[in-house]
Structure formats: structure tokens, C-alpha cells
Regions:
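Non-catalytic terminal accessory segments
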Residues: 1-134
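Short, functional N-terminal and low-complexity linear motifs
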Residues: 40-43, 59, 108-110, 145-148, ...
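Short, functionally important structural connectors and interaction interfaces within domains
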Residues: 63, 128-130, 135, 144, ...
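Hydrophobic alpha-helical transmembrane segments in integral membrane proteins
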Residues: 112, 122-147, 167-172, 176
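Soluble catalytic domains of enzymes that build or remodel membrane lipids, polysaccharides, and related
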Residues: 148-400
Length: 400
């Protein structure tokens, strides 16, 4: 419903951008002032700016649906920076006009130069952001757990989250992730949810993606938990629609579970596994997902109550919530994703006010919490001010 209420605001903002586009381009050359050019520009802009809606409504043919969704993801990111830069330029114009009484700002040359600066800035940020999102960094962590892991002195974990396989990520992204993982020669691979992007059909050639993921090499295997986007849920410009009680079951897509099984990824849903009689891996249900599909999840204490707490306990939980409760439950290493570290500016700043640990490392008593910015993106197909990453965690055990 919120998407419907915000639609008039979105329309007004696009009209605002289009108006200033006419003014700036028109001052570059008289040909751009013609009615024909204005009509063509308006048609092209409307077609692109409405792709969030048309991609939501038009499902077939599948090829057109994909084009609209991909275009929408790129446009939403670019539009965000168009709006920020145009608003900034307009504020500067008003200050120059009413505070400094600068008469030269009304000249054609001033408009043309201002427009060129704005266009260059948008292009620079957008191209850089789109390219940067596709580059995956390797972020290292060193952790010491004051417990014995039987004969195991250390453990190398590769930790990823938020792959968001779909319109923004497919076979190329999967190959890059697997290549980076295998290069680390891990003992264990953990995936903290949001493997999918709300729509299984969004994955282009899922069989190929599964085949690629099966090539992950690790001594003890690959373990994962669900994230809030690991369900079949219609999205309009980032806003979801609640299907109600009768539609809750429709959100579950069995193909997602089958995808993980075929990819040799073991899904843990409020479950714990003892590996090599040395340490536990616990996968937790996602807090947001269970509300939508009307299920319940166990508390951290319930998940660990039957475990041998003398052994190291590794938690995989999509969202970095209830950190104190998790620490009190005897967990030694808590691995989370979800935040994307804000993904794009200014989100990378505001995210710090929303989470106790928005990204990186935090210690709670003897528990180590690591939140990754994710190896993929959600929504806008870009990263500005943040990195796509996989994490390597070298865990040292204090064997007595």
C-alpha cells in the first residue's frame, strides 16, 4: 500500500527532473528547443521511468519482463543520483539568486555549464557504482575462540551473504563468487541468507548457476540459512505486498529449497549440526520471513540448550538482531548479512543509526559478531561507498 501512496511523489519528482532537463538541454542548442525533440525526450523518459511499474505488471513474454526488471533496477539507482544532484544544483542556484543576487545564473551559458556538470556527475557516479558492484573484495578476519574443538586447532571459514541471484546476478556473478571462495581453500563455507531475490523466475539459467555452485570446495561443506528475500514475493519499486493469511503459503517456493539441495548447500532452519565432533553450526530462521509465511522460530537459548557448550558454536542468522541474547546463549561466532552496509550513498551513512553492528566486527562478551556487506546487491544494481565482498574468518581455538 505504501508504494501506491508514494506514487504521486515519484511522479512529481520525475516531472521536476524532466523540467530541468528541458531547460538545461534547451540552452545547449536551439534544436533541442523544438517540440519534436521535447516530445521524443518525454516519451523515452516516461518509458524508462515507469519500468518499475511495467516490470511489476507485465509478466509475459518472459524476455520483455526481464528487460523491464533489469532496466528498472538500473534506473532506480541512476535516478536517485539524478535527483540528488539536480536538487543540489537547484539549491545552489537559489542561494546564488537570492543571497548573492548573481544575475549571470540566468544566462544560457550558465545553464549549459550547470547541466553539463550535473550530467557528468551522474554518469561518473552511476558507471563507477555499477562497475564497482560487480567487483568482489575479500575481507579477512582473525578470531580466537576460548574453547576446545577436539583435535582441531584452527578453522578457516569463508562467509558470504546476500548473493541475490536474480535480475542483478546470474552465472557470471556465481562464477566470480565460487572462484573467490575456492581461492581461499576454506574448511567451511557459510551463507547467511538472501540467496534469492524474491523471484525464482528471475534467475537466468538456474541449472547453470547450480552447476557452478556445486564447484565450491570445502572440507566440511556449505551451510546456509534463509534470508528475508528467500521467498516468492511480488515487489514494486522495493515495496512488497502482503498476500494475507490465505496467501502466506504461496510465498514459499519449493524450487528455492530444491535449488540449494542441487547446489550441495545444506539448509539449516532452526537446526544445529555437529561437525567432525569438533564444533557446531547453527542455522536460524529469518525474523522477517517467518512473519510473512506465518511460522515461528526458536530463541537463541532454545537453539543451543541441547548443545554441548564446551564445544565452539557458530551461528548463521541473516539479520544482526538479538546480539546480546545470542551471546548469552553461549554462541561463539555469529555470522550475519542483510544490511549491505547501506549499499549506496547516503545509505552507507544512515545504516549506522539502524543497527548495533551495521557491518564488520563487533564483540559481545566472548561472542564475535561479523556482519558482511554481501556479495550481491538488491534493487539498484550499483554500490556507492560500499563494497561487495566475501569474508575469510580464521578461527583459532584455545585447546586445553
Amino acid at each position: 500500500m505504501l508504494a501506491i501512496y508514494l506514487a504521486p511523489v515519484y511522479i512529481l519528482l520525475n516531472l521536476y527532473v524532466l523540467r530541468w532537463s528541458y531547460l538545461w538541454i534547451g540552452n545547449c542548442h536551439h534544436l533541442f528547443q523544438s517540440t519534436v525533440f521535447r516530445v521524443i525526450l518525454a516519451i523515452v523518459y516516461v518509458l524508462i521511468s515507469t519500468t518499475p511499474l511495467t516490470g511489476f505488471l507485465i509478466k509475459k513474454p518472459a524476455s520483455l519482463h526481464r528487460i523491464l526488471k533489469v532496466t528498472s533496477n538500473y534506473f532506480l539507482g541512476i535516478f536517485m543520483y539524478i535527483l540528488m544532484i539536480v536538487l543540489s544544483a537547484d539549491i545552489i542556484r537559489l542561494i546564488l539568486k537570492y543571497v548573492f543576487h548573481a544575475s549571470w545564473i540566468h544566462s544560457r551559458v550558465a545553464f549549459a555549464i550547470a547541466g553539463a556538470i550535473c550530467i557528468f556527475s551522474v554518469l561518473l557516479i552511476s558507471i563507477r557504482g555499477i562497475y564497482h558492484a560487480k567487483h568482489i573484495n575479500v575481507t579477512p578476519y582473525e578470531v580466537t575462540v576460548d574453547k576446545s574443538a577436539d583435535e582441531l586447532d584452527s578453522l578457516k571459514i569463508v562467509f558470504i551473504a546476500d548473493t541475490h541471484f536474480g535480475y542483478n546476478a546470474g552465472t557470471i556473478h556465481a562464477k566470480e563468487i565460487v572462484k573467490k571462495i575456492n581461492k581461499q581453500n576454506p574448511d567451511l563455507v557459510c551463507i547467511a541468507g538472501d540467496i534469492f531475490d524474491n523471484e525464482y523466475e528471475a534467475i537466468h539459467e538456474p541449472k547453470k548457476v547450480k552447476k557452478i555452485l556445486r564447484k565450491i570446495n570445502s572440507r566440511y561443506g556449505v551451510y546456509a540459512c534463509w534470508g528475508n528475500h528467500d521467498l516468492n514475493e511480488p515487489i514494486l519499486a522495493g515495496f512488497t505486498f502482503n498476500p494475507g493469511k490465505e496467501g502466506a503459503e504461496s510465498l514459499k517456493d519449493p524450487r528455492m529449497r530444491e535449488f540449494l539441495k542441487d547446489s550441495n548447500i545444506q539448509l539449516l532452519e532452526d537446526e544445529a549440526v555437529l561437525i567432525d565432533n569438533s564444533f557446531y553450526v547453527v542455522g536460524r530462521k529469518d525474523a522477517s520471513l517467518i512473519e510473512k509465511i506465518e511460522e515461528k522460530r526458536k530463541t537463541p537459548a532454545q537453539l543451543t540448550e541441547k548443545l554441548d557448550k564446551d564445544k565452539p558454536i557458530i551461528f548463521i542468522d541473516h539479520q544482526p538482531k538479538e546480539l546480546q541474547e545470542i551471546a548469552d546463549a553461549g554462541v561463539d561466532l555469529d555470522l550475519c548479512g542483510h544490511t549491505h552496509d547501506g549499499q549506496t550513498f547516503p545509505g552507507n551513512i544512515t545504516i549506522k543509526f539502524l543497527w548495533e553492528n551495521p557491518c564488520g566486527y563487533l564483540q559481545k562478551g566472548s561472542m564475535h559478531n561479523i556482519v558482511t556487506s554481501g556479495s550481491g546487491v538488491w534493487g539498484p544494481a550499483m554500490r556507492v561507498g560500499t563494497n561487495s565482498e566475501i569474508c575469510t574468518i580464521n578461527v583459532t581455538f584455545q585447546n586445553s
